[in-house]
A protein has these predicted regions:
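Bacterial N-terminal signal peptides that target proteins for export
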Residues: 1-11
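Sec-dependent signal peptide cleavage junction
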Residues: 18-32
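Acidic Gly/Asp/Thr-rich repetitive segments characteristic of extracellular carbohydrate-active
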Residues: 30-87
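Extracellular beta-strand-rich solenoid/capping regions of secreted or surface-exposed proteins
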Residues: 83-97, 107-133, 141-163, 179-181, ...
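Bacterial N-terminal signal peptides
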Residues: 11-19
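Extracellular Ser/Thr- and Pro-rich, acidic-biased low-complexity repeat/linker "stalks"
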Residues: 28-45, 136, 164-169, 195-200, ...
Length: 248
């Protein structure tokens, strides 16, 4: 009987010891899947469940080259705060879905020759850019001392570019645009379309070095169009016309 009790005590003691050991760290869940408009789908304006789908998003460090699929489309989420030394280009014929994932994407470009045009993201004519933020708090901005726009949509080519904003914040951009007939420190639209469904455009400043249209938050000009279904535009400034929004 004593021998049986001793043998029984061995596995019990081992179990108690194992219970005191720290649990192994679980691998971080890198799966990132949600609708194209954010954490959960919301009908707003012309964006309905009929044209919204769940997508699987690939991690992106914010500075490396984005890989597009055979349809020239990419779904990426920002895995950490990132500082770029060049603007992110969405080229003609390509579609980029970017989830900020609560992180900050900023530009540190300070070249005096390109201050006014050193936008964080450039959406070329014929390209599509879709922005969301599943966690909230994600920002597109410039680092301290750097000047430029948040997002520029289109250009002189009449082939329209499109930008759809469902979430995220475009803030802290200080544009010193030397071109005549331009503007927009947060978002500039030229021969393009910008639809804002959510998110925030705030605290951007259009210094307006040239004779341009102003629009500290948003400027749509030269056949550019801006439709606002939701979101917030606030506390933007311009030396000349319209601190918030200019449409000409």
């Amino acid at each position: 009987m004593k021998l049986w009790k001793r043998l029984l005590a061995i596995p019990i003691a081992a179990s108690l010891v194992m219970g005191l050991l720290p649990a192994p760290a679980l691998a971080e869940d890198t799966a990132h899947s949600h609708p194209i408009c954010g954490e959960a789908h919301t009908d707003i304006g012309d964006h309905t469940g009929d044209n919204c789908k769940d997508a699987t998003w690939t991690a992106w460090d914010g500075t490396s080259t984005i890989t597009y699929d055979t349809n020239n489309t990419a779904y990426v989420y920002l895995e950490k705060d990132a500082t770029r030394e060049s603007r992110l280009e969405v080229k003609a014929g390509y579609t980029l879905y970017l989830c900020l994932n609560g992180q900050k994407l900023e530009s540190s470009l300070t070249s005096s020759a390109s201050q006014g045009m050193s936008q964080v993201i450039n959406v070329s004519n014929g390209a599509k850019f879709i922005l969301c933020d599943c966690k909230g708090g994600g920002t597109i901005t410039h680092s301290s001392g750097a000047k430029g726009k948040g997002v520029r949509v289109g250009g002189s080519d009449p082939a329209a570019a499109t930008f759809s904003m469902y979430g995220g914040t475009i803030s802290g951009n200080h544009a010193d645009d030397p071109r005549s007939g331009a503007g927009g420190a947060g978002v500039e639209i030229q021969n393009g379309t910008f639809k804002m469904y959510g998110g925030t455009i705030s605290d951007n400043y259009e210094e307006n070095a040239g004779s341009n249209y102003g629009g500290g938050g948003v400027c749509a000009h030269t056949s550019g169009t801006f439709t606002m279904y939701g979101g917030i535009i606030s506390d933007n400034q311009s030396v000349t016309d319209a601190g918030g929004v200019t449409v000409v």
